[in-house]
Amino acid sequence: MSAFNEERVLSVHHWTDKLFTFTTTRDETMRFSNGHFTMIGLKVNDKPLLRAYSIVSANYEDHLEFLSIKVPDGPLTSRLQHIKVGDTVIVGKKPTGTLLIDYLLPGKRLYLLSTGTGLAPFMSIIRDPETYEAFEQVVLVHGVREKDELAYHDLVTEHLPQHEFLGEMIGKQLLYYPTVTRESYRTMGRVTDLMASGQMFDDLKLPALDVANDRVMICGSPGMLQDLKTMLEDKLFKEGTTSKPGDFVIERAFAEK
């Protein structure tokens, strides 16, 4: 029995010349938790060429969605960026990952800290009703170089608050904090610097990080992961695992290149 399903591309959207989103059909046997990633790819010379991708879509949706960078000489992304509606993509049948609420201890506030395509798993998490039942407040932080790379900005700010089922919870409980490093924008700076200086908390009118109340998920570049891990551990946060819940979790299966 194959470890993969063949799915058909339903839509493709290019945010910039370096970033794109695509959706595919979803095999009815595909099961995952919000925050999971899976292996996806293309057949090249009859062999699967695969990489780990977080699933953007929520686990109750009838399609799958992924967010990808474009690497000109990347073995997979150099090909994947040219996919069109109707093309076939291979999707792994065994999603996994550490960015699950189950791996966090109970708390009042959940911080979702991302850079670049690290936003992807958090898009499914903020569309999960259980997220808002588990936490009083959810803070989505997305750091990018240029403002056009703020994928899903309009979905988060305009469409989700109007969502038929989630709109009320999202309107009351979700805070969105986009930041840009290389262009003029209302919030500028690296996520780590904005946290270390306290500016992020001032901007959001929130108290400083407190292990008694706050829980954190992190997905992004290797440097950002390490810097935030150090920052949190200095504040006595303990990292959670699949076997022992903690105060923060990190997705290490991939980091954007």
Task: Give a label for each model feature.
Residues S2-V85:
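Ferredoxin-reductase
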